[in-house]
UniProtKB/Swiss-Prot annotation:
Molecular-function GO terms, alphabetical: rRNA binding; structural constituent of ribosome; zinc ion binding
Cleavable signal peptide: none
Top-level taxonomic group: Bacteria
Role summary: Binds 16S rRNA, required for the assembly of 30S particles and may also be responsible for determining the conformation of the 16S rRNA at the A site.
GO biological process: translation
Classification via Gene3D superfamilies: 30s Ribosomal Protein S14, Chain N
Full protein name: Small ribosomal subunit protein uS14
Lineage: Bacteria, Pseudomonadati, Spirochaetota, Spirochaetia, Leptospirales
Pfam families assigned: Ribosomal_S14 (PF00253)
Binding-site residues, Zn(2+): 24, 27, 40, 43
Subunit (UniProt): Part of the 30S ribosomal subunit. Contacts proteins S3 and S10.
One Gene Ontology cellular component annotation held by this UniProt entry: small ribosomal subunit
Amino acid sequence: MAKKSMMERHAKEQKFKVREYNRCPLCGRSRAYLRRFDMCRLCFRDLASKAQIPGVKKSSW
């Protein structure tokens, strides 16, 4: 989990557009963010294994 201070800082309007970055809305993680699903890889993996994300299934080959 991200610190509460980091979450509050992210919510503020940035002075420059370049400083904006994506953060997972579920856990607050800023790294390994998947834009397509709007969450980090850890939350994505957890929800996908519980079959809570429609259209996602485990691949095997």
